[in-house]
Amino acid sequence: MEKISLVTGGSGFLGSHLVDRLIESGKHVIVADNFFTGSKSNLSHLIQNKQLEIMRHDINFPLYVEVDEIWNLACPASPIHYQFDPVQTIKTSVVGAINMLGLAKRTNAKIFQASTSEVYGDPTISPQSEDYLGNVNPIGIRSCYDEGKRAAETLFFDYNRQHGVNIRVARIFNTYGPRMHPDDGRVISNFIVQSLKGMPITIYGDGSQTRSFCYVDDLIDGMLLFMENDKKEKGPMNIGNPVEISIKEVAEMIIRMTGSASKIVYKPLPSDDPMQRCPDISKAKNILSWKPKINLEEGLEKTITYFRAKLA
């Protein structure tokens, strides 16, 4: 019998790539999305596919469907988007988690939570392992996202302990690739769009802060392996690329790869912006035998090709 997967936020950057893979594996997929940051164009190639069902739905309201598994990806994930309506952002993480966990409890569905490396705050150790408790600011301008995701993790583990809900909690690190929103303010999409348009490349701070960037195909591989793992591992589990690089180096790399004449300009660093972000993926390696395969240059090439076509 065909398995039914619910993907909240399924028209977004990560969600749409996940939907592709679930349909390829033969599952019937229900996408629930309010299209605040997602786009139907990310699913346009599947619109005639009978395995796909799309519904406009905000997970702040309960959803009554029969499903075998739930992938909870719904939430604005870039500072520009999540700071636009911070109250709605934290509600989506918390109330949305309660509604999806309630659905999982009722239908006996396995449920995946797309948590984030932001739960570690501005880390004082690097790389960050899952047992690092973080260096966080619960009242800062980023807290609507960071603290919402932390609260969602609490809810997931309490539903597991109290109600036996079968959970998977992944802490997702910086991810990039085709279908990123061109105006979402994330480092790689910003730099590529600015380079292709010949605009100045904007770096916040002096560019010495580091990130580790995982190509979207690698990330989805890790998510699928985690959901299906036969060791019943619940998480939390870091999924990301452990290769660290400075923001300035990324900007220079993209300028070179696009052949752009763009110059770098520096602006003040926003409040609570982490200086380091790098995952310890030992747990994913040991339990899932997973590690990223696509290096940054290869992934950037694919992403630049996508944005060239998008901006043409």
PLM feature spans:
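Glycine/proline-rich active-site loop of Rossmann-fold NAD(P)-dependent oxidoreductases
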Residues: 124, 150, 165-166, 175-190, ...
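Residue-level signal for the nucleotide or nucleotide-sugar donor/cofactor binding architecture
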Residues: 38, 84, 92-95, 143, ...
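A short C-terminal helix-loop "cap" of Rossmann-like NAD(P)-dependent dehydrogenase/epimerase domains
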Residues: 50-52, 130-136, 164-166, 192-203, ...
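Hydrophobic pocket-lining residues that define ligand/cofactor binding sites across diverse proteins
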Residues: 104, 160, 195, 203, ...
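N-terminal Rossmann-like NAD(P)+-binding domain of SDR-like oxidoreductases, especially those catalyzing
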Residues: 1-175, 217-220, 290, 302, ...
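PAPS/PAP-binding and catalytic site of the sulfotransferase fold
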Residues: 246-258, 299-303
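Conserved C-terminal active-site "lid" loop/helix of NAD(P)H-dependent oxidoreductases
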Residues: 216, 236, 268-292, 302
